[in-house]
Amino acid sequence: MAKETFYITTPIYYPSGNLHIGHAYSTVAGDVIARYKRMQGYDVRYLTGTDEHGQKIQEKAQKAGKTEIEYLDEMIAGIKQLWAKLEISNDDFIRTTEERHKHVVEQVFERLLKQGDIYLGEYEGWYSVPDETYYTESQLVDPQYENGKIIGGKSPDSGHEVELVKEESYFFNISKYTDRLLEFYDQNPDFIQPPSRKNEMINNFIKPGLADLAVSRTSFNWGVHVPSNPKHVVYVWIDALVNYISALGYLSDDESLFNKYWPADIHLMAKEIVRFHSIIWPILLMALDLPLPKKVFAHGWILMKDGKMSKSKGNVVDPNILIDRYGLDATRYYLMRELPFGSDGVFTPEAFVERTNFDLANDLGNLVNRTISMINKYFDGELPAYQGPLHELDEEMEAMALETVKSYTESMESLQFSVALSTVWKFISRTNKYIDETTPWVLAKDDSQKDMLGNVMAHLVENIRYAAVLLRPFLTHAPKEIFEQLNINNPQFMEFSSLEQYGVLTEPIMVTGQPKPIFPRLDSEAEIAYIKESMQPPATEEEKEEIPSKPQIDIKDFDKVEIKAATIIDAEHVKKSDKLLKIQVDLDSEQRQIVSGIAKFYTPDDIIGKKVAVVTNLKPAKLMGQKSEGMILSAEKDGVLTLVSLPSAIPNGAVIK
């Protein structure tokens, strides 16, 4: 019997700068949903990606002295590295510069044009380049006047200056779909979540009247061109939104994924783009005669005490720093526990450290440590088999375990992650209290209470197992460590379905002889200071401290190193290594194999076709049994590694001097 499918998407991110913790928030939330649904037995498809067209990208690339795709490839490598670091379990990564996407955008645009939903006109409005959005005069912030007429202002979204732009444009006649859209809302009351977003869409945008939408531009070239009128570039409203179906192969030679997974179960995004997903996207799908997604969920923003994150304010949080210092689980846990999903939440270093110390180290970590230590002390490490409830406290714990699963499931289905985690932690806290109530240290002094003591241990381990299973969507490491230390090796005991009945560990098991702390406690004062320091804006050139240099060398020393241009023609993972890739490079006169420690930052598909710099006169070496004949140059800063890419015009074998 085929599994029930579940298709979830994040927004596709605009790669004009480094991603911050707000972007990580959306993607981790999507990952939690995907892992939860897989744990329930669904056939899940999880999509994320990047929106890579537009004037802003064109200008950024020009400023960097690169082609658009060269600039984008570097930015996307950083995004993929962050997703890998966050252990995002996406099944696909769509780039709007990919042919599979552009092909769909072209066909969709021409179809809408042919059937009269798109028409040619002229557009004039106040345009913000960073936001890639037009605004009406009434929407502008800090409008500037001259002789009673508006001559400028700022974007209500970003605060950037706007400019008056007039250009020929194609328009999407969305106004004719107004009644049909409202009817869909009525028939599908849970389509937009939280409900407050639905009211906002109806009262602020639909009831005042939907204006037809400008869906092409002639003021820049970087994008998908309209096939029948190439001076026009398809604008973001169609280009970006179509990714959700282009990634499934819609209008391709193989539509099997589209037929299997569409419509999407959840489109996940931050609240500032809910309008595009709850108004424009449904109307676009109606025009294409396609089923509409089942749910659009708009979460809130991660705010700081002084408002939105901003580099100039010195309050931007880099998720890389949190992961590197405190671990992935602590970072993912904080994001999903502290911030109520669907509402705005405030990030504070104090709360991050407190959650790590009290919830993870004290409540969960100490429970695991105490339990294993008692089993080693009282039963020489062998956990007695579960015997059922022997007194009222056992019955109470078993009932609470089953009720916890029920409440957790209800919260997860409604995407209330902080509530789901709170439910699990109430159960963990109650289990800690159960130790104090049953007093194992007293029972151990009375041989007649040996069975009772053993059953207390069995209940503790079963409760910990319940918690570990429920935490699997959120924490990618701790549940595995808990199962390992408890020596629970049967995969079926790690599955969600195993929680339907309490007390499945009916055979004795040997726990680890020496429990290891899963979450070490943090020095609160020092770590709060560290996080605050990491949030400061970058130093100016005058403020930067000189980076210690290596000893100077003369030109003769440098001349000993031979560096040549090469193209990566093949790559694969080295077996039994999570760090190494085995790479084949073309040096024109020869091909070589190089083993490189970049697997945590790049997949094989990411690097095939890249032009790189190779040190060719290193002595051959063996790494994990694989011969390596050189070294590919890379750059590293703040724990992020990036390959040194060369312009494609440089021929293979060219010597770099």
Curated annotation (Swiss-Prot):
Q: Where in the cell? A: Cytoplasm
BP GO terms, sorted: methionyl-tRNA aminoacylation
Enzyme class at the top of the EC tree:
ligase
The molecular function terms in GO held by this entry are: ATP binding; methionine-tRNA ligase activity; tRNA binding
InterPro entries given for it?
aa-tRNA-synth_I_CS, Anticodon_Met, M/V/L/I-tRNA-synth_anticd-bd, Met-tRNA-synth_bsu_C, Met-tRNA_synth, Met-tRNA_synth_2, Methionyl/Leucyl_tRNA_Synth, MetRS_core
Residue span(s) of domain tRNA-binding: 557-657
Name any GO cellular component annotation: cytoplasm
Q: In which domain of life is the source organism classified?
A: Bacteria
> What CDD domains does its record include?
Anticodon_Ia_Met (cd07957), MetRS_core (cd00814), tRNA_bind_EcMetRS_like (cd02800)
**Motif 'KMSKS' region: where in chain:** 308-312
Q: What is its main location?
A: cytoplasm
- EC number(s)? 6.1.1.10
Motif range for 'HIGH' region? Answer: 13-23
Reactions that this protein is recorded to catalyse: tRNA(Met) + L-methionine + ATP = L-methionyl-tRNA(Met) + AMP + diphosphate
Q: Where does ATP bind?
A: K311
Keywords in alphabetical order: Aminoacyl-tRNA synthetase, ATP-binding, Cytoplasm, Ligase, Nucleotide-binding, Protein biosynthesis, RNA-binding, tRNA-binding
Function, as annotated, reads: Is required not only for elongation of protein synthesis but also for the initiation of all mRNA translation through initiator tRNA(fMet) aminoacylation.
Tell me how this protein assembles: Homodimer.
The text of the family note is:
Belongs to the class-I aminoacyl-tRNA synthetase family. MetG type 2B subfamily.
This chain's protein is named Methionine--tRNA ligase
Gene source species? Staphylococcus aureus (strain MRSA252)
